Amino acid sequence: MTYRTLCILAFTALISACSSRPTGPTTPPPESVSAISKWETSGRVGIRTKNDAVSGNFNWQKDPKTFALSIVGPFGQGATHLNQSNDGVVTLAYEDTVVTGNNPETLLQQELGWEFPVNQVTYWIRGLAYPNSAAKISKDPDSQLPNKIEQDGWLITYSNFTKVDGLSLPQKMQVSNPPFRVNLIINQWTIQ
């Protein structure tokens, strides 16, 4: 082999090593909000009960069988973690306490005094009515996005939406059933 041939082969190898390679198949974004099977959201939360008020940051990861919800107060104080594993076991961790059960709503009510319908909120946070009960939905006449859902004794109001992968998802919302009220300001959405 000549010197020139070696240089051409080395240059070709160098160029092909630097070229971009496909990273594998990517999951296309969902075609509708109801088709979102896995999501993560984070932002600010304010929770008001009859006797207490809590504010902080939240992060919520959800896939079809599991979820992990964390609420952390100002300066990292007062962290509360609610998780559901693949086998349906729900764990609530707060302060120095860890309890398990099979129903997130029951754990939150018994341990913290919070009435928070976790199963329904996984739909409401996406701007959808919970499919297993009747709902009254009011929509904005221009955008046709929901501005209010009344369901199971709860009032869900939406005051702002944001576009994520071409879909409109809530950015600011309130879930209330007096005296319990939750305000969410969502800073980030990741969907699949």
Curated annotation (Swiss-Prot):
Residue spans crossing the bilayer: none
Membrane-topology annotation of the record: Lipid-anchor
Gene3D superfamilies reported in the protein's UniProt record: Lipoprotein localisation LolA/LolB/LppX
GO cellular component: cell outer membrane
PROSITE patterns: PROKAR_LIPOPROTEIN
Subcellular location as annotated: Cell outer membrane
One GO BP annotation of this record: protein transport
Aminoacyl-tRNA synthetase listed as a keyword: no
Lipidation (S-diacylglycerol cysteine): 18
SUPFAM superfamilies listed in its UniProt record: Prokaryotic lipoproteins and lipoprotein localization factors
CDD domains for this protein: LolB (cd16326)
Principal cellular location given in the protein's record: membrane
Lipid attachment points (N-palmitoyl cysteine): 18
Keyword list, A-Z: Cell outer membrane, Chaperone, Lipoprotein, Membrane, Palmitate, Protein transport, Signal, Transport
Signal peptide positions (record): 1-17
Oligomer status and interactors: Monomer.
Family from the record: Belongs to the LolB family.
Main function: Plays a critical role in the incorporation of lipoproteins in the outer membrane after they are released by the LolA protein.
Name of the protein this chain belongs to: Outer-membrane lipoprotein LolB
Native organism: Marinomonas sp. (strain MWYL1)
Gene this protein is translated from: lolB
